[in-house]
Amino acid sequence: MDYIVGFVSISLVALLYFLLFKPKHTNLPPSPPAWPIVGHLPDLISKNSPPFLDYMSNIAQKYGPLIHLKFGLHSSIFASTKEAAMEVLQTNDKVLSGRQPLPCFRIKPHIDYSILWSDSNSYWKKGRKILHTEIFSQKMLQAQEKNRERVAGNLVNFIMTKVGDVVELRSWLFGCALNVLGHVVFSKDVFEYSDQSDEVGMDKLIHGMLMTGGDFDVASYFPVLARFDLHGLKRKMDEQFKLLIKIWEGEVLARRANRNPEPKDMLDVLIANDFNEHQINAMFMETFGPGSDTNSNIIEWALAQLIKNPDKLAKLREELDRVVGRSSTVKESHFSELPYLQACVKETMRLYPPISIMIPHRCMETCQVMGYTIPKGMDVHVNAHAIGRDPKDWKDPLKFQPERFLDSDIEYNGKQFQFIPFGSGRRICPGRPLAVRIIPLVLASLVHAFGWELPDGVPNEKLDMEELFTLSLCMAKPLRVIPKVRI
């Protein structure tokens, strides 16, 4: 009903806009047949529409590696092969480095101080430099290593109290990721494990903002309507963000009053670099939001695949028992001796990249990609989900086979375009050095400490792996398991 009301209310406005400002671009990439005004939108929202990622895969196979889609009055380009991704993220990295935030994220004053949604201007360069050289530097990550291990241990200890029960891990994995980020940001846990809580804490607010960002918004497809906030998403996002600020503003004020001469976390670093309160709030939100959601989703996917494939799980357990031992706990110092663990994480990211359709790169100036003309102002998306499942680059692409990475030189650095879970080029995810530490640490801790069974006698091979894509890619049905003690 929400869709119908939205389309009826805007049809006349859209028609007028279409007639007055009909695009005159030529030499665009190929495009499937489209409806007048609404473009390809009905292909996504009709009753029999396939899931979005399946739809994107199908049309890429039919129309080629670079396609042009029109959702309402918003046109976008989608790159779905490693060759197309290379031209977008490497050849045209600079000219395709712009950003256009989703309407619901355009809340003042946050959007004016955003790094994630900023064009590659001087403020963006300063923020990215601080993230790379200080906050996610080797030195600071090493200094926080024990905190990450303690956070992973706390998760294991809590699950120990649930041994034999049917549990959903998702909220606890999300909270664990939040606590890791809490120590990155201001050296504190921000989530407490509990069975039930009605308290609206940081976890619920951040999760709420992520859900709001993934909701249907007619303004995303008909930009002329953005000012009206027809679904109330921008208002809702603003309310949630203000509540988040209240949680950490006391810590920010206290640190300003007592500056740390040797910065130990993000807050210290930002204060030392004279960031104002709006800049700090924006940086905090863009650390907690994307980092908690993507990291926890990957861990859930990895554990689900291992449960579904008992031979892979047994192989990983054998490696952990041999290297870590049954009387010890997993440490980051073990990583260099755990190649199969690393292969399991990479294979999970190949199948389920953290951001399956990357945040769009806005074209700053008209450019050429694969012989096609991309006009100034158009958004270009890279489909990492399709690239990671391309049969030209991956044998049996839909199978979970960590072994494919054991004798491979493929890394997370975005240089090999068949595997770009964190993106590539100047817009590569700045939190990558943290993610490749916390994901294997938590996954290994869960596999090492527990045996896992599916409830109701469901065979492992019948585990439901249906995907749900919003801002990120998660399991459509949260993983429900029964933990059994191993160590």
Swiss-Prot record:
| Coiled-coil ranges per UniProt | none
What EC number(s) does its UniProt record assign? Answer: 1.14.19.66
Q: Write down the InterPro entries for this protein, in alphabetical order.
A: Cyt_P450 (IPR001128), Cyt_P450_CS (IPR017972), Cyt_P450_E_grp-I (IPR002401), Cyt_P450_sf (IPR036396)
Q: Which keywords does UniProt give here? A: Alkaloid metabolism, Endoplasmic reticulum, Heme, Iron, Membrane, Metal-binding, Microsome, Monooxygenase, Oxidoreductase
The Swiss-Prot or TrEMBL record lists the needed cofactor(s) as: heme
Places the protein is found? Endoplasmic reticulum membrane; Microsome membrane
Name one process (GO BP) from the record: berbamunine biosynthetic process
Query: GO MF annotations for this entry?
Result: berbamunine synthase activity; heme binding; iron ion binding; monooxygenase activity
Name of one Pfam family that matches:
p450
Name the pathway. Answer: Alkaloid biosynthesis; berbamunine biosynthesis; berbamunine from (R)-N-methylcoclaurine and (S)-N-methylcoclaurine: step 1/1
Q: Which reaction does it catalyse?
A: (R)-N-methylcoclaurine + (S)-N-methylcoclaurine + reduced [NADPH--hemoprotein reductase] + O2 = berbamunine + oxidized [NADPH--hemoprotein reductase] + 2 H2O + H(+)
Q: Which family does it belong to?
A: Belongs to the cytochrome P450 family.
Protein name (database record): Berbamunine synthase
Question: What organism, scientifically named, is this protein from?
Answer: Berberis stolonifera (Barberry)
